[in-house]
Amino acid sequence: MNSLLMITACFVLIGTVWAKDGYLVDAKGCKKNCYKLGKNDYCNRECRMKHRGGSYGYCYGFGCYCEGLSDSTPTWPLPNKTCSGK
């Protein structure tokens, strides 16, 4: 019984450690812009939206960077898509 509990705990930790990080993108494939570097309420709110599943967001390099995103959330750079809307 203890072994099963330990294995389950390991899977939970692995899922947490392997969460996706990256810059959020807009509809054109560009990074979501931000101007207040560091702790940023806008980025944190955008990252933590339910459909994105992020755990924390902040402004880094004038783009919203998120930690703990779900695998289905697209992050910059998008393959085969430039930041021009084409």
Swiss-Prot record:
Domain LCN-type CS-alpha/beta: 20-84
CDD domains for this protein: neurotoxins_LC_scorpion
SUPFAM superfamilies listed in its UniProt record: Scorpion toxin-like
Keyword Iron belongs to the record: no
Modified residues (Serine amide): 84
Origin superkingdom: Eukaryota
InterPro entries: LCN-type_CS_alpha_beta_dom, Scorpion_toxin-like, Scorpion_toxin-like_sf, Scorpion_toxinL, Scorpion_toxinL/defensin
Subcellular location: Secreted
GO molecular function: sodium channel inhibitor activity; toxin activity
Keyword Secreted: yes
Cellular component per GO, a single term: extracellular region
A Pfam family of this chain: Toxin_3
Cystines in this chain: 30-83, 34-59, 43-64, 47-66
SMART domains: Knot1 (SM00505)
Keywords, sorted A to Z: Amidation, Disulfide bond, Ion channel impairing toxin, Neurotoxin, Secreted, Signal, Toxin, Voltage-gated sodium channel impairing toxin
Swiss-Prot/TrEMBL domain comment: Has the structural arrangement of an alpha-helix connected to antiparallel beta-sheets by disulfide bonds (CS-alpha/beta).
Its biological purpose: Beta toxins bind voltage-independently at site-4 of sodium channels (Nav) and shift the voltage of activation toward more negative potentials thereby affecting sodium channel activation and promoting spontaneous and repetitive firing.
Family as reported in the entry's similarity comment: Belongs to the long (4 C-C) scorpion toxin superfamily. Sodium channel inhibitor family. Beta subfamily.
Name listed for the protein in its UniProt record: Toxin Cn1
